[in-house]
């Protein structure tokens, strides 16, 4: 058993060690040769084990000479040269005994230099792209290199840096404005670029001060807009600082009086501007940023302010980002948001207010998605195919949020601009292709009448009759197709405090106002209805019969319930008071058409104050 354990590894005999020593002119005893043979076996096993680790790390099954040389260098041993050839070395036996050695052929350098045949290269010709940027000193910096920490600045640049930082972080707004304008146009501050980027990266240390965060974002905006600066390796740091202001739950957001929403809007717009103007430098960040926004949006532990930042960030990156990230996760996210909005407890008031912010941001994003999808479906619609037409992806659409105007009058992309991914940018895979009607029907089930964009969701228009031989398809269920809600107007003219809708008071009021009651037209049930220019609508006030006391005043109140398939809905009521100013009575002589259908006939009497209640 002991002999088997001793023979688990291949051992070099002491005779081989003695022969190697004699070839160099040394004589060894048996004890020394045995000790050297044992040590040589251990060193070879160690080098072989390390070289096999290098082979496994490169996912290969063949051990090469380079792996063995790496193992020798790892053990601080000089590498063995001359064995890296792909061809096997010829071995020759010695005459004296069973000893083999590699054959070393003599090579004539003169014949090799004067040879006419040129050896072919071992590898195929390949082209490798290497991008270099100019650093602050005018030298070429290789791609991905980190600038050195120690750099020498002139006294003028150092004074400029100190004055600008004091002006930006100081208390004088006019001086800060001048400093930011100079940062945006100065062409001699390339050496100070890493220092200003380091200042902008300090947003993580001042998350409790919104004013300082706004100023640092303005510094980043000025650096990005400077046409004389090449951001190069610093653009990743700037994008990270901007994303911190967009997504992170800042310490200043704890106080509800702090307007951190504007900070997130401005940071999202700045992120869109970076991708629009420096797409070649951030080509590898588009996918990572979309994944970061998606991760924050789908995390229920994150606060609602972070969800708001994720939504406005997707909106700033364009409607395609909204379609690929926000729209697929909307059904899952809507359940949690609806639970927050339906909680009417006093302790949930602030969280509910934040939920309404997120609700509004999602509404603005999906409305832009609907508009851009509609324009993509109808490219030849009027106004889009004429003179000066540009694709939908290139149009700098306006937004309801913060907008910026670039220097020099150049157009700049705002929120929801349909910004396409920059050249060379690979975005996430497109979701399942859905038609505009399917997307609108799905969004209408969430938002109801809050959507400003309107498309038909009811039954399709009747088509031509089918031949008798065709099989009639079953009609869709009433619940499966959601129709647009219909406004119902109840035209009830309310009397004033001293008047009553009864007969006597009505006659007195009529006589006082010197106006005749409206004649009633009795028509037989089978008589045909008169067709005119206003066919299909009914007028509330068919004639101008106002009292001489002055022009009447109208108060419109629209109320209803925002309902959907996934929620009970919320009641809402909005009043639209008319301006009380001097206006001629002829302004109200025009006919007001009814909205929808009337539930009952209107009762009329002469008044100077009318009320129109429109429940949904």
Curated annotation (Swiss-Prot):
Protein's organism: Mus musculus (Mouse)
Family, per entry: Belongs to the TAF6 family.
Gene3D superfamilies, sorted: Histone, subunit A, TAF6, C-terminal HEAT repeat domain
Region (Disordered): 399-432, 455-539
Domain of life: Eukaryota
Positions bearing Phosphoserine: 494, 500
Name of the molecule in the record: TAF6-like RNA polymerase II p300/CBP-associated factor-associated factor 65 kDa subunit 6L
InterPro entries, sorted: ARM-type_fold, Histone-fold, TAF6, TAF6_C, TAF6_C_sf, TAF_TATA-bd_Histone-like_dom
């Amino acid at each position: 058993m002991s002999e088997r354990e001793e023979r688990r590894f291949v051992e070099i005999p002491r005779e081989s060690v003695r022969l190697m020593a004699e070839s160099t002119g040394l004589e060894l005893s048996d004890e020394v040769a045995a000790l050297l043979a044992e040590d040589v076996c251990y060193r070879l096993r160690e080098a072989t084990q390390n070289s096999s680790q290098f082979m496994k790390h490169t996912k290969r099954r063949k051990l090469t000479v380079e792996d063995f040389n790496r193992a020798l260098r790892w053990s601080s041993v000089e590498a063995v040269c001359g064995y890296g050839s792909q061809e096997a070395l010829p071995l020759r036996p010695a005459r004296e005994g069973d000893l083999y050695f590699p054959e070393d052929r003599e090579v004539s350098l003169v014949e090799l230099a004067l040879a006419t045949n040129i050896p072919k290269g071992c590898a195929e010709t390949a082209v490798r792209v290497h991008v270099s940027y100019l650093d602050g000193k005018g030298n070429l910096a290789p791609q991905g290199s980190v600038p050195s920490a120690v750099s020498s600045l002139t006294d003028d640049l150092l004074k400029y840096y100190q004055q600008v930082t004091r002006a930006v972080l100081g208390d004088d707004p006019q001086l800060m404005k001048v400093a930011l304008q100079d940062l945006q146009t100065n062409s001699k501050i390339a050496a100070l670029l890493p220092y200003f980027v380091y200042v902008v990266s300090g947003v993580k240390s001042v998350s409790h001060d919104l004013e300082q965060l706004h100023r640092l974002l303005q510094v980043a905006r000025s650096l990005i807009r400077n046409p004389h600066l090449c951001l190069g390796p610093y653009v990743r740091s700037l994008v990270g600082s901007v994303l911190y202001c967009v997504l992170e739950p800042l310490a200043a957001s704890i106080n509800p009086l702090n307007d951190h929403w504007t900070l997130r809007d401005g940071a999202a717009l700045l992120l869109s501007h970076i991708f629009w103007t420096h797409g070649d430098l951030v080509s590898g960040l588009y996918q990572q940023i979309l994944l970061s926004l998606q991760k924050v949006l789908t995390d229920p532990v994150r606060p609602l302010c972070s969800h708001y930042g994720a939504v406005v960030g997707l909106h700033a990156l364009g409607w395609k980002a909204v379609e690929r990230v926000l729209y697929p996760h909307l059904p899952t996210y809507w359940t949690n948001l609806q639970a927050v909005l339906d909680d009417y407890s006093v302790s949930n008031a602030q969280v509910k207010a934040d939920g309404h912010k997120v609700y509004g941001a999602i509404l603005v994003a999906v409305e832009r998605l609907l508009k851009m999808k509609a324009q993509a479906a109808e490219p030849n619609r009027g106004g889009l195919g004429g003179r000066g037409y540009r694709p939908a992806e290139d149009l700098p659409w306006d937004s309801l949020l913060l907008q910026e105007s670039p220097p020099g009058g150049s157009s700049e992309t705002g929120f929801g601009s349909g910004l396409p991914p920059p050249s060379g940018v690979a975005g996430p895979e497109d979701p399942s292709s859905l038609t505009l009607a399917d997307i609108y029907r799905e969004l209408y089930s969430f938002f109801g009448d809050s959507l400003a964009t309107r498309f038909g969701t009811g039954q399709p228009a009747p088509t031509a009759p089918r031949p008798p031989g065709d099989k009639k398809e079953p009609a869709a269920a009433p619940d499966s197709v959601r129709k647009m809600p219909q406004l119902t107007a109840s035209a009830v003219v309310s009397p004033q405090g001293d008047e009553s809708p009864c007969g006597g008071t009505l006659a007195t009021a009529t006589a006082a106002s010197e106006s005749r009651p409206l004649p009633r037209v009795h028509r037989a049930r089978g008589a045909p209805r008169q067709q005119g220019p206003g066919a299909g609508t009914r007028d509330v006030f068919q004639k101008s019969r106002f009292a001489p006391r002055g022009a009447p005043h109208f108060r419109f109140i629209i109320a209803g319930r925002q309902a959907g398939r996934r929620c009970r809905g919320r009641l809402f009521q909005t009043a639209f008071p008319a301006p009380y100013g001097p206006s001629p009575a002829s302004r109200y002589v025009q006919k007001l058409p009814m909205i929808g259908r009337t539930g009952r006939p209107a009762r009329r009497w002469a008044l100077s104050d009318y009320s129109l209640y429109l429940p949904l």
